[in-house]
């Protein structure tokens, strides 16, 4: 990625085995759903890190208070909004880039959280008001202590927001997050390592330093072909030295408070049969 390297080590239960996915037979286990949420958060974070900067925008799109919104209307509204927004960007010779998720409040009110590249916020607000009659608030993207976009927390928040609709029978989208097709993915390299190369305290490489706050040694969920079970995992981030040397004091914005994204309290009993 632009400013760092994200390392993810895990044990592969399929190594050296011919294991194929069996057809779905029953509801997806909770552990597997959690794993899929975590994987979606990682992919979403990679796209944010590679395509957005601190000057880009975090939008919150809402509907008028106490106005119930059906999923079909929400889908049509957001599609129409993106079509108008794409046209507005094109007039300024800018290519629209976006990532968004749909959520619901405890009272069932639909809202969207969206990342877009830098643009006139007055135009964006007027377009959404014209389509939905609702409001729009915005901030610049949240930064971390090193002064670059805090893509991990933003991605976690987006996936947490999508859980409010994705696990309902009347879900708005069939995806955990929606993104424009022009987003670039970082280069992903896979390699086999020996057990002795798995250090509890990982070492850095030339030109990078290990972010001590990012080190995680624990367990993740592994599909061994028969059932989902725990496996040993390690995650950490390598920060480019140039970022650390050039960082300045920046005003830090914090995300709204929310429960731990993958805690036991965040799971809804109302799930569709096709999950």
Labelled PLM ranges:
Residues 1-108, 118-275:
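Right-hand nucleic-acid polymerase module
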């Amino acid at each position: 990625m632009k400013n760092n390297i994200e390392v993810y080590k895990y044990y592969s239960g399929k190594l050296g085995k011919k294991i194929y996915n069996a057809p779905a037979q029953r509801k997806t286990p909770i552990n597997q759903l959690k794993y899929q949420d975590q994987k979606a958060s990682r992919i979403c974070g990679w796209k944010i890190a590679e395509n957005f900067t601190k000057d880009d925008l975090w939008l919150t799109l809402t509907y008028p208070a106490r106005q119930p919104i059906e999923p079909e209307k929400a889908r049509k509204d957001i599609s129409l909004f993106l079509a108008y927004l794409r046209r507005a960007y094109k007039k300024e010779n800018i290519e629209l880039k976006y990532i968004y998720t749909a959520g619901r409040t405890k009272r069932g009110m639909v809202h969207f959280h969206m990342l877009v590249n830098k643009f006139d916020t007055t135009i964006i607000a007027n377009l959404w008001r014209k389509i939905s009659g609702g409001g729009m608030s915005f901030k610049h993207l949240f930064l971390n202590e090193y002064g670059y976009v805090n893509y991990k927390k933003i991605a976690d928040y987006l996936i947490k927001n999508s859980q409010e609709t994705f696990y309902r029978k009347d879900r708005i989208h069939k995806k955990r997050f929606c993104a424009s097709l022009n987003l670039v993915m970082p280069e992903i390299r896979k390699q086999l390592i020996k057990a002795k190369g798995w250090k509890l305290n990982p070492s850095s490489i030339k030109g990078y330093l290990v972010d001590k706050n990012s080190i995680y040694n624990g367990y993740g969920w592994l599909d061994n072909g028969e059932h989902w079970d725990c496996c040993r995992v390690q995650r950490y981030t390598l920060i480019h030295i140039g970022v650390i040397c050039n960082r300045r004091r920046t005003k830090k914005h914090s995300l709204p408070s929310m429960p731990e994204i993958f805690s036991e309290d965040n799971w809804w009993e109302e799930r569709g049969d096709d999950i």
